[in-house]
């Protein structure tokens, strides 16, 4: 992308425009020559092998993200069970991942295919806005989901006070805040001339002040990654502490009650069977959702941390020069971040067994295969039952008993408890 330090400043950027945040500071002389600013002839060049790899990975990422998140939404729609708050958050997080797939991955793949952005200035600004909007929405949906788990675990009484209304307000706030915080893209990016000789135009970033790129990348990194990670870490710190205190208290209470009950039971001559507590069951369900949310947050951090680290390094380290050979590092970190939208659906299905079953049953071909397998299992079970009943029938067993050398008195019928 291009950085402009003033009216006469030349373009600067990586050898290819990429992704929502990249400002591309630090052009080399070879890149300036390619843009028509050096002594050599102007040429539009890029690493074609890297571009083909990026296009292939983006295509696979888009297909897997759309298939996985659409399956989750379809399964949630068809599930006969009562929709819980967690299902509501999963639905909107899947919608946010679909926004990343359609508004970030798909436009970037088309852009890489054409090399230069093909469209008017307003479309350039809209595409850049929607690319960052998906990233904000995915991050903030994780924040509100974790906040809901924090309230459920640490303040369970508040979950009885209109929980559905509070959850919907949190989700609506996440969507609105994501849309508002991504609007600076309209003022940063535009269609500008990137080649002084060929007059080639592209959708690049423009900054009036030299420190504009640092402020922009720092703001986006803080809003999309640092602030959400700090909030997520704080919430999970309180959640883990509360669960630890809860488990320790239950263990001590169970041991004291067990000792008292064992003494009374020993005196009366019988043993009391332990009863199952409903509080314990609810706690296990909450812990399972907390584990699922923790895995989703971990996947988000692992996928996006390299991208934001590279971006911050490129604008804050004065000694960093992103040469053409180092561009694969930027591309690979960006592709790793886009894979996050593919991971979440499988995490949902792993922690929700019925969700995977409902997802499989949503496809007609899978339903036909399931009915076929069920029919085969039923026929096989019927044949086994028929064979067993024939061998145990009175007509066959009478003849065998008569021919037996042993006396019938030796046969003892032992009652079987049912």
From Swiss-Prot:
- Glyco sites are at 27, 196
- Write down which residues bear the modification named Phosphoserine: 404
An example Gene Ontology cellular component term from the record?
endocytic vesicle
One Pfam family hit: 7tm_1
Task: Name residues in a coiled coil.
Answer: none
- Report biased composition (Polar residues) as residue ranges: 383-399
Q: Which key words tag this protein in UniProt?
A: Cell membrane, Disulfide bond, G-protein coupled receptor, Glycoprotein, Lipoprotein, Membrane, Palmitate, Phosphoprotein, Receptor, Transducer, Transmembrane, Transmembrane helix
Say where the lipid (S-palmitoyl cysteine) is covalently attached. 365-366
Q: Segment Disordered: which positions?
A: 1-43, 377-410
Gene Ontology BP annotations: blood circulation; calcium-mediated signaling; cellular response to hormone stimulus; cellular response to water deprivation; G protein-coupled receptor signaling pathway; generation of precursor metabolites and energy; grooming behavior; maternal aggressive behavior
- The disulfides recorded in the entry are 124-203
- SMART domains for this protein: DUF1856 (SM01164)
SUPFAM superfamilies to which the protein is assigned, alphabetical: Family A G protein-coupled receptor-like
Q: Which residues form the signal peptide?
A: none
- Quote the function comment for this protein: Receptor for arginine vasopressin. The activity of this receptor is mediated by G proteins which activate a phosphatidyl-inositol-calcium second messenger system. Has been involved in social behaviors, including affiliation and attachment.
**Misc. remarks from the entry:** Differences in regional receptor expression in the brain as well as differences in social behavior may result from a highly variable repetitive sequence in the 5' flanking region of AVPR1A. One such allelic variant has been linked to autism.
What name has this protein been given in UniProt? Vasopressin V1a receptor
Q: Which organism is it from?
A: Homo sapiens (Human)
């Amino acid at each position: 992308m291009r950085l402009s330090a003033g009216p006469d400043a030349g373009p600067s950027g990586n050898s290819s425009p990429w992704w929502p945040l990249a400002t591309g500071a630090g052009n080399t002389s070879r890149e300036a020559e390619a843009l028509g600013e050096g002594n050599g002839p102007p040429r539009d060049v890029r690493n074609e092998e890297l571009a083909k790899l990026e296009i292939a990975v983006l295509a696979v990422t888009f297909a897997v993200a759309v298939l996985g998140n659409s399956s989750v939404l379809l399964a949630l729609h068809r599930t006969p069970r009562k929709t819980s708050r967690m299902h509501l958050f999963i639905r909107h997080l899947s919608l946010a991942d679909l926004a990343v797939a359609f508004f970030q991955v798909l436009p970037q793949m088309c852009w890489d295919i054409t090399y230069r952005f093909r469209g008017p200035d307003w479309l350039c600004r809209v595409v850049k806005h929607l690319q960052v909007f998906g990233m904000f929405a995915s991050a903030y949906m994780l924040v509100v989901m974790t906040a809901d788990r924090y309230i459920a675990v640490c303040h369970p009484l508040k979950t009885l006070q209109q929980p559905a209304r509070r959850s919907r307000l949190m989700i609506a706030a996440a969507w609105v805040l994501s849309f508002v915080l991504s609007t600076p893209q309209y003022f940063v990016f535009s269609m500008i001339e990137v080649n002084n000789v060929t007059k080639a135009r592209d959708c690049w970033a423009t900054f009036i002040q030299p420190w504009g790129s640092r402020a922009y990348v720092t703001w986006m990194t803080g809003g999309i990654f640092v602030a959400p990670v700090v909030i997520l870490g704080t919430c999970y710190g309180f959640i883990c502490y509360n669960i630890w205190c809860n488990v320790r208290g239950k263990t001590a209470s169970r041991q004291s009650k067990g000792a008292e009950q064992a003494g009374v039971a020993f005196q009366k001559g019988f043993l009391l069977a332990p009863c199952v507590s409903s509080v314990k069951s609810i706690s296990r369900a909450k812990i399972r959702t907390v584990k699922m949310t923790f895995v989703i947050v971990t996947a988000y951090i692992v996928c996006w941390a390299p991208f934001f680290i590279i971006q911050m390094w490129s604008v804050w380290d004065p000694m960093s020069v992103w040469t053409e050979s180092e561009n694969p590092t930027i591309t690979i970190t960006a592709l790793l971040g886009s894979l996050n939208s593919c991971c979440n659906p499988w995490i949902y299905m792993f922690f929700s067994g019925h969700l995977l079953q409902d997802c499989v049953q949503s496809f007609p071909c899978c339903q036909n295969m399931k009915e076929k397998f069920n029919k085969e299992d039923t026929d096989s079970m019927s044949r086994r039952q028929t064979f067993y009943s024939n061998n145990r029938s009175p007509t066959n067993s009478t003849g065998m008993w008569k021919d037996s050398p042993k006396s019938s008195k030796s046969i003892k019928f032992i009652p079987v408890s049912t």
